[in-house]
Amino acid sequence: MLIHIPSVLTVEEVAHCRQIMAGAEWVDGRVTAGPQSAMVKNNLQIPLSSDAHREMRDIVLRALGRNPTYNSAALPLRVVPPLFNRYDAGMSFAAHVDNAIRPIHETGARVRTDLSSTLFLSEPDEYDGGELVLHEPGSTQELKLPAGDMVLYPTTALHSVNEVTRGSRLASFFWTQSMIADEARRRIMFELDRTIMDLRTRLPDDDLAVLNLTNCYHNLMRQWCVL
């Protein structure tokens, strides 16, 4: 289930992150890659220990906390603190698999990567190439979203970033451990939540149909969530 979530960051938040990135230190992006991914990864990242990273990390985490679509679709239990990268002309990231388990840099805790997110920080017309490509059996899907928009997709998907041929592509990326590991069950919960929200626009909250469907949602959460 791939979900495009518009305006995760406000225009002002994007501009502030861009300003921070303009003055930040950048290092080889392979520092956070596994052995296989490191062989095909060619980009730059902001160091995890830097003040720039910490400030932007907090901006993104606050934005995720207030975004109902992300919280409904991901049902997040833990989030690997967002990372920030840059692809200049000639840089790319060939098809690769993300690690199933990732550490949290500051605490050493480990997170199971159920969902991957890319939060775009450059406008599509600022660079050529640089599309995020999801490789599914028999098909591929390319994404290049407006600054502030995010794509959420299962970490099980093979994916790549096309070579940038002009300009620079700025983005944040991170992983989420969901309270529900199974993708099919997460989809059911997301669709059920959206149905309840739609029903509430047409019926009062104390309507029996709304109450019964909401009760079903929470009973499924009790059955399927692992905390």
From Swiss-Prot:
Keyword check for Oxidoreductase, yes or no.
yes
What keywords are annotated for this sequence in UniProt? Dioxygenase, Iron, Metal-binding, Oxidoreductase, Vitamin C
Q: Does the keyword Kinase apply?
A: no
Q: Enumerate the residues binding Fe cation.
A: 96, 98, 159
On cofactor binding, the record's note says:
Binds 1 Fe(2+) ion per subunit.
**GO BP field:** DNA damage response; intracellular iron ion homeostasis
**Superkingdom field:** Bacteria
Q: What is this protein called?
A: PKHD-type hydroxylase GDI1238/Gdia_1949
